[in-house]
Amino acid sequence: TGLFWTPYSTTAMSAAEKFAAPSLQHLFGTDNFGRDIFSRVMKGCSTTLAISFLVVLFSGTMGILLGAVTGYFGGLLDEIVMRITDAVNGFPSILLTLVIISLLGTGKQNVILALGIVFIPSYVRIVRGEFMRLRDADYIRRARLMGVGRIRILFVHILPNIFSVFWASVMIGFNNAILAESSMSYLGIGVNPPDASLGNMLSDAQGYLQSAPWCVLA
């Protein structure tokens, strides 16, 4: 199962069809285990996109919650959260991700968690800045005078007005998540075989560039 249709099983092996060249039967050929490369590319795209979506969903949600509270209320909590985000940003992203993965282990869930943690600070800063800008706007002051509760002000009156800015950062984050997941899987610390990922497929195929170049070119 996945986001895209696959004509063959992505894990079924066939010694008789090992390194079959591209044909009408196998559009992108087969790999060293006789698996259909087209099916695995489709599955790899599905895996990478799904992981990237969940990374952005997790980090974006946490970024909204932390950024909204710290940006609106300020104070000690704001200071603590900002110092934590500064500390996270102080480490190279790939290094911090490697540390988290080394503690948690490889696998889809841990990749999502590791990348999600690394991506949170960027969303916190964007949301915090927008909430700080809007918390003293005239319409927010009028809402307070009318007795509107803080939670409603945060998530009904302010949050919808930052989505134009937040959406742009989400798109950038999604692209970065795709690159990060592919890089991690290529290095062998992301999605584990036999699950297909664009990164681990490229890593497996590079050794056959001379004998079966379609494995890499696909």
Please annotate each region the language model reported.
Residues 1-33, 187-196:
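Hydrophobic alpha-helical transmembrane segments of membrane transport/permease proteins
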Residues 38-46, 50, 78-89, 105, ...:
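Alpha-helical membrane-interface segments at transmembrane helix boundaries
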Residues 37-72:
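Transmembrane alpha-helix signature in integral membrane proteins
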Residues 101-103, 130-131, 179-218:
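Glycine-rich helix-loop "coupling/hinge" segments at transmembrane-helix boundaries
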Residues 27, 31, 62, 71-72, ...:
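Generic hydrophobic transmembrane alpha-helix motif, especially the helices
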Residues 68, 97-102, 111, 115, ...:
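Transmembrane alpha-helix boundary and packing residues in multipass membrane permease domains
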Residues 38-52, 102-122, 214-218:
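Loop-to-helix entry region at the N-terminal start of transmembrane alpha-helices
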